[in-house]
UniProtKB/Swiss-Prot annotation:
Class of the enzyme per the UniProt entry, highest EC level: hydrolase
CDD domains named among the record's database cross-references: M20_DapE_proteobac
Signal sequence extent: none
EC number per UniProt: 3.5.1.18
Known function: Catalyzes the hydrolysis of N-succinyl-L,L-diaminopimelic acid (SDAP), forming succinate and LL-2,6-diaminopimelate (DAP), an intermediate involved in the bacterial biosynthesis of lysine and meso-diaminopimelic acid, an essential component of bacterial cell walls.
Gene Ontology MF annotations: acetylornithine deacetylase activity; cobalt ion binding; succinyl-diaminopimelate desuccinylase activity; zinc ion binding
Organism for this UniProt entry: Pseudomonas entomophila (strain L48)
PROSITE patterns: ARGE_DAPE_CPG2_2
The protein's required cofactors: Zn(2+); Co(2+)
Cofactor stoichiometry and binding remark: Binds 2 Zn(2+) or Co(2+) ions per subunit.
Disulfide bonds listed in the record: none
Name listed for the protein in its UniProt record: Succinyl-diaminopimelate desuccinylase
Keywords: Amino-acid biosynthesis, Cobalt, Diaminopimelate biosynthesis, Hydrolase, Lysine biosynthesis, Metal-binding, Zinc
Family statement drawn from the similarity comment of this UniProt entry: Belongs to the peptidase M20A family. DapE subfamily.
């Protein structure tokens, strides 16, 4: 373990945040620590608590000029079985291999520390910078995400706040820091389908209507359907059935209904309405008695090459020597809410190989490099 006095400012703050067990939606005073640091260098602070979720909005600078926002979350997922960890999950230990170990090291307290330290340095080096540096931080990203970034964005919209560029600190890198940035995400549309039949005795199938038999051809057609071709930025839309339930548990009873849970991860080539209409047409084609409940988690968004992506890519190249690869793969993030403000959004953070796993860890030295990347991006856009 590296002695605390030997740690960089970024690593000291990262360790402090990791040691706070902020399992979603609990913040465990992580945001207080961040706000104290930002307030000390002149940021205007606005805590925003919605229901049981802590959020804050912080700004430095003037309304004139563009706004660059750092966004992220202080909440982490549960640890899982603590006895399976090599070290205590909230110990924030740097091991003999130079790995910073602990829940949230990658997702995403390391990024938060880098954002704060980079911003402290930037506003001290450029006190009269153009535009604004902003922070949008929540403790509700790993949970339902109803009262976090989504709620803050709704408030900012109501106040006609401007947000030109946003860097989300999600762990975007795959093998080496900065090798991948996310410049968009697919949309996520979930559904619970209920197909009704008629319960009966398996020995008298003519007196029953088996919903499993009825639904199987329709589900097979949905699974085989080619929804779109994708485009230069997105792969084709995917359809996956995640749960299928029917039956009473008895071997001699034809069930009365079937439920299926499925999800679309969809590109900008498809729309919510279009997907819903095509699903309905296939179900009707098979003459099913059905009902469906839809749940939209987020629309697809895309940041095409431009000022933000150029600044981030150039900063990664200057600090690491690497050419970054923009990607829209993976799950959803809070970037989907921020993008609704017309904001260019890029996700850039540590290597994601161990996120949500036992023994989550990242290379400790990567956080100092990430701080420099964030700092250089600030300089390129707002100095």
């Amino acid at each position: 373990m590296t002695a605390p006095a030997e740690l960089s400012p970024t690593l000291q703050l990262a360790c402090d945040l990791i040691r706070r067990p902020s399992v979603t939606p609990v913040d465990a005073d992580c945001q207080t620590q961040m706000m104290n640091r930002l307030g000390a260098v002149g940021f205007q602070l606005e805590p925003m608590r919605f229901e049981d979720v802590d959020n804050f909005w912080a700004t430095h600078g003037t309304q004139d000029g563009p706004v660059l926002c750092f966004a992220g979350h202080t909440d982490v997922v549960p640890t899982g079985p603590v006895q399976q960890w090599q070290h205590e999950p909230f110990e924030a230990l740097i091991d003999a291999d130079g790995m910073l170990c602990g829940r949230g090291a990658a997702d995403m307290k390391g990024s938060l520390a880098s954002m704060v330290v980079a911003s402290e340095r930037f506003v001290q080096d450029y006190p009269n910078h153009r535009g604004k540096v902003a922070f949008l931080i929540t403790s509700d990203e790993e949970g339902p995400a109803h009262h976090g970034t989504k709620a803050v964005v709704e408030l900012l919209k109501a106040r006609n706040e401007r947000l030109d560029w946003c860097i989300v600190g999600e762990p975007s890198s795959t093998t080496l820091l900065g090798d991948v940035v996310k410049n968009g995400r697919r949309g996520s549309l979930g559904a619970k389908l209920t197909v009704r039949g008629k319960q009966g005795h398996v020995a008298y199938p003519h007196l029953a209507r088996n919903p499993i038999h009825l639904a199987a051809p329709a589900l097979a057609e949905l699974a085989a359907e080619h929804w779109d071709e994708g485009n230069a930025f997105f792969p084709p839309t995917s359809f996956q059935i995640s749960n299928l339930n029917s039956g009473t548990g008895a071997t001699n009873v034809v069930p009365g209904d079937l439920t299926a849970l499925f999800n679309f991860r969809f590109s900008t080539e498809s729309t919510v309405e279009g997907l819903q209409e095509r699903v309905a047409a296939i179900l009707d084609k098979h003459q099913l008695e059905w009902s469906i409940d839809w749940a939209l988690s987020g629309l697809p968004f895309l940041t095409e090459p431009g000022e933000l992506l150029d600044a981030v890519s150039s900063s990664i190249k200057a600090v690491t020597g690497r050419e970054t690869q923009p990607s829209t793969s993976g799950g959803t993030s809070d970037g989907r809410f921020i993008a609704t403000m017309g904001t260019q959004v890029v996700e850039l953070g540590p290597v994601n190989a161990t996120i949500h796993q036992v023994d989550e860890r990242i290379l400790a030295s990567d956080l100092d490099l990430l701080t420099e990347i964030y700092y250089q991006t600030l300089v390129r856009l707002l100095a």
